[in-house]
Regions:
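An N-terminal-biased, well-structured beta-alpha scaffold segment characteristic
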Residues: 1-96
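Short, ordered loop/turn segments at secondary-structure junctions
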Residues: 8-9, 32-35, 63, 83-84, ...
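Rossmann-fold NAD(P)-binding glycine/threonine-rich loop
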Residues: 83-110, 247-280
Length: 280
């Protein structure tokens, strides 16, 4: 059996760690330059992929190119962290291959060692705060100098799942003042346990594990509740998504136009439409 590991379109992540490759008993093939961005050396004595249509199993992380899918052999197995839209896109392109996505794994104890989605979401939350801190022209923590005090940045986080919680924790460790919002009932306790302040909206909190779609009227109330917070924030990070559906728009274009100069928005829901109006 031939197993191939290939790069994502952006090349930032690899579907396998170099140290794990020796554990496989199958015939392993790697795409050339798979670990270049990660600063790992290519493992020795491992074959380079020459033809995709010779591989029985192909693993990637998330962003796979159409030309790669088209070149897979008939009956091949494709493994990755694909959302519902991506799965349908791949199946429409190649109905003759099998697609397995970690995105669809149930959140149960027996499957915890396969929960790649949570690990990636944790990294996303962490990396997004560091990227925002790099992009803003302000310092994140409070600083006391002989010339006076520099106030800490205000960070607003929308969507408090795994990524959002990690973003809160990271921003707090950097010394920011943090506010957060989520429509789920359990989110308030989670936010406050990390030392952040919860933004209240005049909508009914959801009791579900995952956020569910709300009416246009309810969404309008959420936008109004968040408007003042967004305008006053130095950094806004959005993670709000609804499984299998378009991401809710939480920030209107008019709100963005009224934000402070040099403030930063990073929309992590851009792949499903975005939480910020105008996200591309």
């Amino acid at each position: 059996m031939k197993i191939g590991f290939i790069k994502d379109v952006d090349g930032y992540r690899a579907p396998v760690h170099p140290e794990s490759i020796d554990k496989y008993t199958a015939d392993i093939h790697l795409e050339k330059g798979l670990f270049d961005y990660l600063n790992y050396s290519e493992p020795k004595n491992v074959k380079t992929i020459s033809k995709l249509n010779e591989l029985d199993i192909v693993a990637c992380v998330e962003n796979i190119q159409h030309k790669v899918v088209k070149n897979l052999k008939e009956g091949a197995v494709l493994i990755g962290i694909f959302d519902f839209d991506k799965i349908n896109e791949i199946k429409n392109l190649r109905p003759d291959i099998k697609v397995f996505s970690f995105f669809k794994l149930p959140r149960i104890s027996r499957a915890q060692n396969l929960d790649a989605l949570s690990s990636q979401a944790n990294l996303l939350g962490y990396a997004s705060v560091l990227r925002a801190a790099k992009e803003t022209s302000d310092v994140v923590p409070m600083m006391t100098t002989a010339a006076g005090n520099i106030q800490p940045s205000k960070v607003l986080i929308l969507g408090v799942g795994v990524a959002g919680l990690q973003a809160i924790a990271t921003a707090k460790r950097l010394g920011a003042r943090v506010w957060a919002f989520d429509i789920r009932k359990e989110a308030k306790d989670q936010v406050e346990s990390l030392g952040a302040k919860f933004v209240e909206a005049s909508t009914e909190a959801q009791d579900s594990v995952y956020a569910q779609e709300v009416s246009d009227e309810e969404n309008q109330k959420i936008q109004e509740a968040l408007k003042k917070q967004v305008i006053e924030s130095d950094i806004v990070l959005t993670f709000a998504q609804i499984p299998g559906k378009k991401a809710p728009v939480l920030i209107e274009k008019s709100t963005v136009e009224n934000m402070k100069e040099n403030s930063v928005i990073i929309d992590l829901a851009a792949g499903t439409g975005g939480n910020c109006e105008g996200t591309e």
